[in-house]
Amino acid sequence: MTNRPKLIVTAVALLAMSASLAQSERSDVEDPNEALKIAALEALISAPPERALPLVIKVLDANNTDEVKERALFVLSQIDLPEAQARLLEVARSSDPELSAEAVRMIGIGGNPEALAGLGELYSEGDEDLREAVLEAYMIAGDVDAVHAIATNASDADEFGAAVEMLGVMGAVDRLQALSETSGFTEELIQALGIAGGDNVNATLMTIYRDAETDDIRHAALEGMLISGYDEGVLELYKESTDVNEKRDLLQMLAIMDSDAMMEVIDAALEGGDQ
């Protein structure tokens, strides 16, 4: 009897590989032999795992181009065998920075819990590029806990900023709120909230702006509204402000946001009144 869920997953993976291959053929892959190898790898996605694995490993061990090996890593990420996940981690720990980062991302695509757990050590020992790849892998896999842990244990502002930005991309508003309870609403956290967006976030950004004790935090709240597209909030702040300089800044933000209300506000400002 056909395993329908597995068949669907295989079909989706095959379509993803086909799209990637099509892009490759339009740009990087000029050697017909290389294109044929990539096509052969694509076909392996639908092969039995125990038969596909040794062939993929053979490609990785041979003197192939990075393009071919990257395709092999993708196929490897789709093979649900412990040996495949172990090999992905092995490549991720290799000295080749490009293949290492690609292997990390493929671990994210594969979503294997054991392989994902192995990324923690890689993150701790890796350079900035590898750490970025690990964060991307966690994002692809939807591993909010891992990204939150990185933000919590960050050793500097840059590391913290990268982690909270990824939490914003993942829409993890609750984790961002939790971080604010220990670190306060930093500029990085505020901008990450803007990336996450949503009605609750917009209300939080308004509160942060109104309660801000520094211009930097106030500006970060505005940037958060810009990122989330909350021009209604900026317009509300403009209408309630009595400070000319503040109104000017808010008007400029409305212009940047290309708000529908901008022309009405400009007309009122030129008339010397408020809207």
Region roles according to the model:
Residues 36-49:
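Alpha-helical segment of the N-proximal tetratricopeptide repeat
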Residues 10-18:
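Bacterial N-terminal signal peptides
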Residues 43-46, 75, 106, 137, ...:
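Core register positions within helices of long alpha-helical scaffolds
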Residues 23-28, 49-61, 70, 81-93, ...:
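Amphipathic alpha-helical scaffolding segments comprising HEAT/armadillo-like alpha-solenoid repeats
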Residues 2-9:
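Bacterial N-terminal signal peptides that target proteins for export
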Residues 35-37, 67-69, 98-100, 129-131, ...:
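Positions within the helices of HEAT/ARM-like alpha-solenoid repeats
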